[in-house]
């Protein structure tokens, strides 16, 4: 690099998948310059061994394992262990992991009073973020990141308690009594009964639904340095506690452009249905650069190819609709929209393929979830990724995150007394 007649050299960092980056840690010290990269499109904030994503080739791997293989063969808690601890668990390790999570599924009864304080009309993600942060009050001892046993207990506690709290958010909204974990059942089966079981009836587990939800949560497990994950790492870099950091991730995930996208997909489909169900009209609106309408659930900030997660969850979505025998015009519109967009040269040339949000929203709606609850399920899936990234950041000794800026406000000016303004 040449600046003001001087030449500067900066090292190239190469990742294990041959990704290359310019290390500019000494840029300001040497030149007085900083870089400006709105939205961090070209900025790597860290080195990470958790997730590899190649948007050009449509590749997603957790700790080296292809997402397609994990979704087909693994259980969600196996993948959670993999993300957090770096390796797939042995049978003995996996049994202990599940037992320890079971041990922590009871939530302090005072949390019920906190939940009672939220109005039923409150947005579920706001309640989840607040309640997750409140868990800090019941777990005040900071996690000793240098003690493997302490970290392990904190990880299991976070997975257990945030899952329970998420179900309470749903049940409060629906006016149902709060539910508790059944240690005789698996994790995915428990999520379904925690949310949907009612006291007067036996909840029957549908294996097709269990399989689809297991896949969906695995696909949501981690996605490199996205908005919510980067938020968790940034908040955690101040040595904020695990629950506080997770709560910040929940808040970031809440946004319509991040985790809220699956809700936006269903809202779009309902808008099309209310207009008469004519897909072509809305396809043309999406093509019109002067029209504010945006086709939700298509394209991705990172993937320039088909989202590998979408291929998997499309099959699961079809399985769920068939298993439940649902005849909803919304799903017919979704299939028509998908077909038209996949065949239309406008969308093909711009790599606007259906993404994971397009299909996940369909599954959540088929399960009977209220629109505003979709992102709560997303948060349960993303929880292991947040924990893994927080753990990696804390144990890696990363400095506190402190981005810089280019100031574009007023230059120095004198204060004007009130009576002279």
PLM-predicted stretches and their roles:
Residues 1-421:
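Non-transmembrane, aqueous-exposed alpha-helical and coiled segments at domain scale
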């Amino acid at each position: 690099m040449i600046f003001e007649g001087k030449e500067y050299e900066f090292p190239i960092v190469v990742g294990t998948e041959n990704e290359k980056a310019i290390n500019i840690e000494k840029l300001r010290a040497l030149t007085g310059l900083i870089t400006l990269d709105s939205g961090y499109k070209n900025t790597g904030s860290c080195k990470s061994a958790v997730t590899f994503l190649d948007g050009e080739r449509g590749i997603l791997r957790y700790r080296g394992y292809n997402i397609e293989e994990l979704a087909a063969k693994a259980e969600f808690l196996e993948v959670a262990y993999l993300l957090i601890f770096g390796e797939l668990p042995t049978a003995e390790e996996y049994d202990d992991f599940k037992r320890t999570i079971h041990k922590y599924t009871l939530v302090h009864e005072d949390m019920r009073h906190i939940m009672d304080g939220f109005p039923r009309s409150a947005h579920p993600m706001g309640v989840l973020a607040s309640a997750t942060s409140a868990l800090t009050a019941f777990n005040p001892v900071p996690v000793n990141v240098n003690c493997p046993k302490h970290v392990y207990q904190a990880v299991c506690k976070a997975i257990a308690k945030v899952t329970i709290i998420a179900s309470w958010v749903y049940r409060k909204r629906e006016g149902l009594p709060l539910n508790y974990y059944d240690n005789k059942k698996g994790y995915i089966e428990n999520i379904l009964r925690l949310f949907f079981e009612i006291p007067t009836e036996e909840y029957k587990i549908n294996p097709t639904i269990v399989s689809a939800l297991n896949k969906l949560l695995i696909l949501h497990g981690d996605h490199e340095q996205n908005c919510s994950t980067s938020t968790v790492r940034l908040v955690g870099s101040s040595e904020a506690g695990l629950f506080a950091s997770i709560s910040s991730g929940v808040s970031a995930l809440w946004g319509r452009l991040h985790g809220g996208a699956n809700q936006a997909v269903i809202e779009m489909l309902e808008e099309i249905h209310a207009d008469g169900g004519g897909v072509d009209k809305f396809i043309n609106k999406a093509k019109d650069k002067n029209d504010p309408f945006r086709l939700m659930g298509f394209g991705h900030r990172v993937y320039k190819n088909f989202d590998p997660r979408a291929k998997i969850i499309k099959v699961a979505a079809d399985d769920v609709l068939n298993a439940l025998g649902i005849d909803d015009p919304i799903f017919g519109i979704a299939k028509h929209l998908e077909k038209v967009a996949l065949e239309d040269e406008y969308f093909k040339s711009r790599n606007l393929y259906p993404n994971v949000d397009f299909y996940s929203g369909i599954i959540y709606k088929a399960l009977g979830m209220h629109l505003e609850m979709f992102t709560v399920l997303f948060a349960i899936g993303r929880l292991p990724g947040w924990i893994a990234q927080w753990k990696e950041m804390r144990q890696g000794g990363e400095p506190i995150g402190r981005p810089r800026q280019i100031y574009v406000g007023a230059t120095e000016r004198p204060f004007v007394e009130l009576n002279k303004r």
